[in-house]
Amino acid sequence: MRFTKMQGIGNDYVYVNCFEEKVETAAKLAQIISDRHFGIGSDGLILIEPSRTADVRMRIFNADGSEAEMCGNGIRCVAKYVYEHKLATPRGSLSVPGQPICPASLNIETGNGILTVGLIIDEGDKVQKVCVNMGQPILTPKDIPVKLVGEKVIEQPIEILGGELLTTCVSTGNPHAVFFCDDVEEIELEKIGPAIENHKLFPNRINAHFVQVENPKEFIMRSWERGSGITLACGSGGCACCVAAVLTNRCNRICTAHLAGGDLDLNWNRQDNCVYLTGPAVEVFNGTWPEN
């Protein structure tokens, strides 16, 4: 099976072109190849498949084999792969207020519906950055889902490891719990991350993010991803943190997230209420995985 290793600011996945390759046990394969000692090493597996409703379809499997609805860093890499390998004909330009016009776009089917991505292409016809319309954030507790009351979950207290933390919950394709703090480096993420992910208030488990706001235009974040653990970056999580920062009057709607793997440009657009995520997509290497 041929594969391509790609990363978006350090959030790395193994990508398989299912126009040419067949994957029968994706969940099991994701667990094996994601192992950083005995496999290829990644945060998970992403399949690029034909779609009846969009240009292509992407399926995401976490390192533990569970299937995710969406991955903001992953979809950017899918867009780069599809364009550069000519798996689909690009559509027209994508224009987002306050950002450069993307000259070409693609529609990608995800577990969260069809998303439009704009391509920022260099003179060598290579995709350098991708702007993703992540859609409108979901704030209703039952739709995130979280077992908390109210129209929105904004800085509500929850008990974690014998203490109390204030959380703001958002779905940007998958569920996120955001916690603001003074210093993200002081958070024992290895300890508190799994406790939040598997908390009884989150029926589908949840991604946990700790955010240190620097000023109204930028914040630092660290992530514990559902099914993958600590990662260098989380694109959909960055979008959720942007929304949470706006809802709590900490940041502007256009801001930059600083993550361990790099930066993401975020825009919770007032006109259409959609969140736009812009960041790089990088091909690391190609390889062949043995049949057995």
Regions found by a protein language model. Give the residues of each.
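Ligand-binding beta-strand-loop-alpha-helix segment within the catalytic cores
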Residues: 138
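Extended Gly/Ser/Thr-rich low-complexity repeat segments
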Residues: 141-150, 286-291
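Short, solvent-exposed secondary-structure boundary/capping segments
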Residues: 125-134
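N-terminal, positively charged, Ser/Thr/Ala/Gly-biased leader segments
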Residues: 1-22, 132, 144, 149-170
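A glycine-rich beta-to-alpha transition motif near the start of alpha/beta enzyme domains, typified by
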Residues: 1-126, 177-292
